[in-house]
Amino acid sequence: MKLIVGLGNPGIEYQFTPHNLGFLAIDRIAGNLGVEVRNRQCRALTARTVIADQMVLLAKPETFMNLSGLSVRELVAEYEAKPESDLIVIQDELDFPLGTLRIHTRRSSAGHNGIESLIGALGTQDFLRIRIGVAPERKVGDGQSYLLAPLRKAELKVVDGILDTAEDAVKMILKDGPAAAMNRFNRKDESGQ
């Protein structure tokens, strides 16, 4: 079983914020597959489905971003998953421009509290990450305030497109492997840069 975890914060007030792009990506994938992420287990909302002929569990931790590792550690244990081969995490990335996407593995948290929580809880940084850029073109004072504020209408249009790209990245990772997906999606012309 592959675990595909989107990071975000529960609650309607956070639904369309930059920090919730992981949740939005999971919702997009689930919606396109005709499943609902609503089963509660291991402090997360989950749904089982098949992608690229593989059984997967889509998950959205309900522990809030900074404690995401608690839920993910329980999911990894429950499904006897190996983080280095069975876990894909979809996260927002303030260091990348809005609408860009990169796939990485074995990286530090780069200051992302949700990823820091996962690394601490799992005892490894060796897991695959789909990092979706959220840095705005406009200047923002406080990054944390921006991450938790609703996206503007123009930003939502960009997000709509990158969520499709994130879904394509997940499918390619599962079908062709991480290296092939990195080769395709980490190129500048595929990410909007």
Question: Where do the PLM segments sit?
Answer:
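Active-site YXXXK catalytic motif of short-chain dehydrogenase/reductase
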Residues: H112
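Conserved TIR/SEFIR loop-to-helix hotspot centered on a Trp-containing motif
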Residues: S109
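Nucleotide and nucleotide-moiety/phosphate-recognizing core
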Residues: K2-R106, E116-I130, E137-D142, A149, ...
